[in-house]
Amino acid sequence: MATITPVFKDGKRDNVTCYSPISKLSCVSKIFEHVIYKKLFFLTKSWISPNQHGFFSGRSTITNLTVFSEYCLSALEHGSQVEEVYTDFSKAFDKLSHTILFSKLQQFGFHSNFLKWIKSYLSNRVCKVVVEEFESRPYVQTSGVPQGSVLGPLFFNLFINDISLCFKNSKFLLYADDLKIYLRTDRVIAGLF
């Protein structure tokens, strides 16, 4: 059973949506996840978009910003500007559909026994929420990946990876569930300076 502790992000403390659910998992579970993670990451690292900078060794918020900054500087040097849109998928880790994840993993060609294990690992997860000395009744988590788990971020990256198919005429960068879509435009910007 996972114990979920709500961790405050920002906003009003009396608003439940301003908290992230962090799962406290058993040490045995985490050790097992580390073993699976090493193998799974080795098999999938070449599949994950180079535009995803979250939860990927050698990539970070810094590499994400560096790629974007270099693109912007190049545009400015050529007399252009860059239009961008920033998005953040609300509750992306909590709402991740297990059915869609299993389908995507199947498309990657994973062995059926491994897929059964992943399905077993994510399905019927019993959780309870603990806040100070108060604790909820146990409930079954029907979607999402456990935040605080070792495999959760990799599952999320594999889940969101095909978003790259949506951007044929623009650039994009991801940092986990934060998406930046951008494009160089050739508008005259001399009047701005």
Residue spans of the language-model regions?
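Short, conserved phosphate/pyrophosphate- and ester-handling motifs at nucleotide-, phospho-/glycolipid
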Residues: 148, 152
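Conserved helix-loop-beta segment at the catalytic/binding core of cyclic-nucleotide signaling proteins
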Residues: 167-173
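Substrate-binding beta-hairpin/strand module that engages nucleic acids
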Residues: 173, 180-181
